[in-house]
Amino acid sequence: PMPVATHPDSEFAHAVYAAVAAIPAGRVASYGDIARQAGFPRHARFVGRLMGRLPEDSRLPWWRVLRSDGRIALTGNNAERQRQRLEQEEVVLVGGRVDLGRFSAFR
């Protein structure tokens, strides 16, 4: 069974999805930023778990969510897909890292 917090129909999940949906093109947010925007500070890890469970056809802009150091948390093909999506939106990665001071949606 899934922890209540990360169940896709939980209040937490709906708040997280709304925060992710609010990230405009060309901007990014960290897992912690999303947790704070959703009203659940200190729940960044649960945000990561929820994002990892999104269905393949999700319309949420999952690629705009990064680690707190501005790096992509995904690996392999998924990391490459995320990098390509960010670059299509003119988000600059230098050394695999996005400057959150410049590109963050919520800071």
Language-model regions, residue ranges each:
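Nucleic acid-binding interface residues in structured DNA/RNA-binding domains
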Residues: M2-R107
